[in-house]
From Swiss-Prot:
Source organism, top-level taxon: Eukaryota
Source organism of this protein record: Homo sapiens
Protein's UniProt name: Putative uncharacterized protein ADORA2A-AS1
Ranges where the record places region Disordered: 1-23, 91-110
Note: This protein has no orthologs in other species and appears to be the product of a protein-coding gene which has arisen since divergence from chimp.
Amino acid sequence: MEQDWQPGEEVTPGPEPCSKGQAPLYPIVHVTELKHTDPNFPSNSNAVGTSSGWNRIGTGCSHTWDWRFSCTQQALLPLLGAWEWSIDTEAGGGRREQSQKPCSNGGPAAAGEGRVLPSPCFPWSTCQAAIHKVCRWQGCTRPALLAPSLATLKEHSYP
């Protein structure tokens, strides 16, 4: 079951498909900033970590507001891979923005901003998730390269 998540907290993405003989990376995702301009909506929008590895921002769906985010991966080694970010309003003729940026040495790797226009409410009780799929790490490495002491990597067995 999905858990409520607040900006500044950490979530661990789920596995990504990898080539044979490789393991998915599980760096901790840290969304450092989520802001909007609507004074009637809380400044820290709710977001949740999903099993697909995306962070989803929950929004009030009747407001026009500006959003901004940035993400860092906090693994202890410089891991090869890339951040992928996607903004999808999914309503009112939904608008999607996507970008992929390279990541090196575990530094800040993704950021974006834009505007969301008012749209009809979604059929769930909290009337949220007008924007979702913010940041997801995409990268693979051979299991032999992973040290078991890395707190940011989950254990996983492969045939």
